[in-house]
């Protein structure tokens, strides 16, 4: 089928549509062994206030493809898309991507697209639409069963004098955490833009545990954090997985080796709650973070890539 003949629907999602997106994402993950959509798009499926555009290609009784465009940053936009395994090689992905590009061109926005797992099909789609890789996001992992070098065999990473750790207090620490997060990730296009609404959505998730959201304080001021995530619905016959969900240090506390100390504290907490494999995501060009995590025993597992048109990447 010519992709120009495919009907791409752009409209807010109904509750039934949101359920269909979840089914579509699960079907693709089952085949590809990589989740096609990250957490943020899934949290925003029914968020009428979110600056997002939803694109759908419908099949007879379900979705053949879905894309979400995040228009929250001035002059730019970021998209994620997924095509059902039964609908691949029929132009669905091309239709979704080209429609998204046309919409953002009309708004004067530069569009980039995430490909989770950097799969051959995504690379092929990018080549057909003239996109090139402009950014890498590494997924790193660490078994806590002793099969690799872990912090248990490395020197301890004590907190700097005057720095203490405590658990996050929902509703009390929100503003302070959002401020530190924005400063720590000032150059990060997603993490640094988190809002109170974004934080509240995550606190409401089944996996949230305030005891696994560690805050570092100095003289009563928040200077760093290590937020951990242990998904609630894990299979019983597989190793229990936990994630260093977000780790940040306020610029005012740089030089205190807080990143190393927070990583060690996070790993200790994950051991306490029975995690056997730890995952995290970090920018491929963040040499400081990669060095910290590598020293803790992490290795690169997979790579997500963000792609854009060459002219946009150099603009």
Swiss-Prot record:
Main function: Catalyzes the transfer of acetyl from acetyl-CoA to desacetylmycothiol (Cys-GlcN-Ins) to form mycothiol.
Keyword Transferase belongs to the record: yes
Binding site for acetyl-CoA 1: 81-83, 89-94
EC number from the UniProt entry: 2.3.1.189
Catalysed reactions listed for this entry: 1D-myo-inositol 2-(L-cysteinylamino)-2-deoxy-alpha-D-glucopyranoside + acetyl-CoA = mycothiol + CoA + H(+)
One Gene Ontology MF term: mycothiol synthase activity
UniProt keyword Repeat present: yes
Keywords of the record: Acyltransferase, Repeat, Transferase
Gene: mshD
Family, per entry: Belongs to the acetyltransferase family. MshD subfamily.
Domain N-acetyltransferase: 8-145, 163-315
Protein name (Swiss-Prot/TrEMBL): Mycothiol acetyltransferase
Stored PROSITE patterns: GNAT (PS51186)
Subunit description: Monomer.
Organism: Sanguibacter keddieii (strain ATCC 51767 / DSM 10542 / NCFB 3025 / ST-74)
């Amino acid at each position: 089928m010519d992709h120009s003949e495919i009907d791409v629907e752009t409209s807010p999602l109904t509750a039934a549509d949101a359920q269909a997106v979840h089914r579509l994402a699960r079907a693709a993950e089952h085949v590809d062994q990589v989740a096609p959509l990250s957490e943020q798009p899934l949290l925003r499926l029914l968020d009428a206030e979110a600056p997002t555009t939803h694109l759908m290609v419908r099949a007879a009784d379900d979705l053949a493809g879905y894309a979400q465009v995040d228009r929250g940053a001035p002059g730019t936009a970021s998209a994620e898309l997924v095509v059902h395994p039964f609908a691949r090689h029929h132009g669905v992905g091309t239709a979704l991507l080209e429609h998204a590009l046309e919409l953002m061109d009309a708004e004067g926005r530069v569009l980039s697209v995430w490909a989770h797992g950097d799969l051959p099909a995504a690379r092929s789609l990018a080549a057909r639409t003239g996109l090139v890789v402009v950014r890498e996001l590494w997924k790193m992992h660490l078994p806590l069963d002793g099969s690799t070098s872990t912090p248990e065999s490395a020197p301890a990473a004590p907190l700097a004098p005057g720095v203490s750790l405590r658990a996050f207090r929902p509703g009390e620490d929100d503003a302070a955490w959002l401020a530190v997060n924005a400063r720590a990730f000032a150059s990060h296009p997603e993490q640094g833009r988190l809002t109170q609404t974004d934080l509240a959505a995550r606190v409401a998730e089944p996996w949230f545990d305030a005891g696994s959201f560690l805050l570092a304080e100095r003289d009563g001021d928040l200077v760093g954090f290590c937020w951990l995530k242990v998904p609630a619905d894990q299979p019983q016959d597989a190793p229990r997985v936990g994630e260093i969900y977000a780790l940040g240090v306020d610029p005012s506390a740089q030089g205190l080796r807080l990143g190393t100390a927070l990583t060690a504290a996070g790993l200790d907490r994950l051991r306490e709650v029975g995690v056997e494999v730890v995952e995290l995501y970090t920018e491929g060009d963040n040499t400081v973070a990669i060095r910290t995590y590598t020293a803790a025993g992490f290795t690169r597992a997979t790579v997500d890539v963000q792609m854009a048109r060459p002219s946009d990447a150099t603009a």
